[in-house]
Amino acid sequence: MAKVSAIQKNKSRQKKSQRLHNKRSALKSKIYDKSLSLEQRFSLIIALAQLPRNSSSTRIRNRCELTGRPRGVTRKFGISRNKLRELIGRGLVPGVVKASW
């Protein structure tokens, strides 16, 4: 089980990222607009840098929904490989069966 503080930190990053996503993407699109002057684009870069670091989507870590484990998380199910194997073995994941040939 991961530390509760690490899980909470990641959740707050997700909330900040969702809240500031539109503002961040608007600034980025204006920065890459070649019709603007260099001074205007530079001021937009500074405005982007003033946003909180944790509002960037790259700082969000995929974590297991059950245990909070940061590694080995499957995108499709949102849980770690260990818990996925355990749940599949019990037959709790619909549509997934253990391979046998």
Curated annotation (Swiss-Prot):
HAMAP family: Ribosomal_uS14_1. Residues 1-25 are annotated as: Disordered. SUPFAM superfamilies: Glucocorticoid receptor-like (DNA-binding domain). Residues 10-25 have a biased composition (Basic residues). Keywords: Ribonucleoprotein, Ribosomal protein, RNA-binding, rRNA-binding. It comes from Rickettsia typhi (strain ATCC VR-144 / Wilmington). One of its GO terms (cellular component) is cytoplasm. GO terms for molecular function: rRNA binding; structural constituent of ribosome. This is Small ribosomal subunit protein uS14. Pfam families: Ribosomal_S14. GO terms for biological process: translation. The keyword Ribonucleoprotein applies. Binds 16S rRNA, required for the assembly of 30S particles and may also be responsible for determining the conformation of the 16S rRNA at the A site.
